């Protein structure tokens, strides 16, 4: 495990050495998701030669743990439910979307539903078993596909009407087309087991229960996103990251923070946490955008380009015009 043995500090040292070796006097640093964690470590330990830093979907090293993803999901769910409620065509049925989703989680956790679907990428039909935990994970995973948000309420309504196929098709498609592979899962587990699990602030199950008190406890054992990591740590056997690796990043380097309001992985609250110690930073929050903001938002791309041109005064005017998507109408209740 040589990659994990050096941890984030070692990886950042190699990047700093690369800048010098290439003869680059100054460079602009970009990080997204876990890459923002590395970028902040680079700012803290090797600030020389950094002209600007862009942090997209911000993960502050001082707050992230496996248990933190339940409250993050709660923040995302609440915002999407509110956005849906604000659009009459989104959910013209009773009970409301949040209550309906909670009922579905409880029902499916007690009585999972199996169905055969063809993944969106084609191929042979695959069997998908949809339980409460998998339903929650489906919702969290929508953060990676901003274009799909407009259909989320309608898909929940179809499930409530007894048709699991729309959601099951997305679940199957993620599995067959993720492209992560064994190495990707190994890298992710190495990070989580070295940098997050040893610094948990309590049981991930207890944290999940506080975030979603109406969900069955079995949803958090170990279904919810990365709550399996504490169990995996016992067999993965990577060394614990040093405490200083999880320090906040005080820096005066011009920094752009980009956050999506529908990001249940790295929520906007995390971007605000990072901003507290970055006095020369600009925070842009994008309504209705999920994870990887610059990939999903033309406005974010404009802000990013403006920031690279003038890091001290980026033009963020377009952010005010960004709105949540117009949701597809939910089908009426059957029966």
Residue ranges and their predicted role:
Residues 11-26:
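Conserved acidic catalytic loop of the alpha/beta-hydrolase fold
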Residues 13, 31-43:
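Glycine-rich nucleophile elbow surrounding the catalytic serine of serine-hydrolase chemistry
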Residues 29-31, 56, 258:
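Short beta-strand immediately N-terminal to the catalytic nucleophile in serine-hydrolase-like folds
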Residues 41-104, 138-141, 154-179:
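A catalytic-pocket lid/entrance helix-loop region that shapes and gates access to the active site
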Residues 100-253, 296-297, 313, 324-333:
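Alpha/beta-hydrolase fold active-site neighborhood
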Residues 148, 264-270:
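Conserved alpha/beta-hydrolase "acid-adjacent" motif
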Residues 254-262:
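Conserved strand-to-loop "acid loop" that flanks and positions the catalytic carboxylate
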Residues 287-335:
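Catalytic active-site module of serine/aspartate enzymes centered on a nucleophile-bearing elbow/loop
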């Amino acid at each position: 495990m040589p990659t994990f043995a050096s941890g984030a500090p070692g990886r950042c040292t190699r990047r700093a050495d690369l800048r010098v070796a290439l003869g680059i006097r100054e460079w602009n640093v970009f990080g997204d998701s876990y890459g923002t964690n590395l970028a902040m470590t680079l700012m803290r330990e090797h600030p020389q030669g950094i002209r600007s830093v862009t942090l997209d979907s911000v993960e502050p090293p001082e707050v992230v743990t496996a248990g933190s993803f339940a409250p993050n999901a709660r923040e995302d769910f609440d915002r999407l439910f509110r956005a849906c409620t604000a659009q009459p065509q989104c959910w013209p049925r009773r009970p409301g979307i949040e209550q309906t989703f909670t009922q579905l989680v409880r029902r499916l956790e007690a009585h999972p539903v199996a169905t055969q679907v063809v993944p969106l990428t084609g191929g042979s039909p695959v069997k998908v078993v949809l339980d409460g935990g998998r339903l929650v994970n489906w919702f969290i995973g929508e953060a990676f596909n901003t274009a799909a948000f407009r259909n989320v309420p309608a898909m929940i309504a179809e499930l409530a009407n007894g048709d699991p196929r729309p959601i099951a098709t997305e679940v199957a498609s993620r599995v067959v087309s993720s492209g992560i592979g064994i190495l990707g899962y190994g890298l992710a587990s190495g990070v989580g087991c070295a940098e997050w699990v040893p610094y948990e602030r309590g049981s991930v199950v207890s944290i999940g229960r506080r975030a979603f008190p109406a969900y069955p406890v079995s949803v958090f054992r170990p279904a919810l996103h990365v709550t399996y990591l504490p169990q995996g740590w016992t067999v993965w056997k990577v060394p614990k990251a040093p405490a200083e690796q999880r320090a906040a990043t005080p820096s005066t380097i011009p920094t752009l923070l980009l956050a999506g309001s529908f990001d249940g992985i790295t929520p906007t609250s995390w971007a605000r946490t990072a901003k507290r110690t970055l006095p020369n930073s600009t925070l842009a929050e994008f309504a209705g955008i999920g994870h990887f903001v610059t990939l999903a938002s033309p406005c974010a791309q404009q802000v990013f380009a403006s920031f690279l041109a003038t890091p001290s005064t980026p033009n963020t005017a377009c952010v005010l015009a960004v709105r949540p998507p117009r949701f597809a109408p939910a089908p009426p209740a059957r029966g």
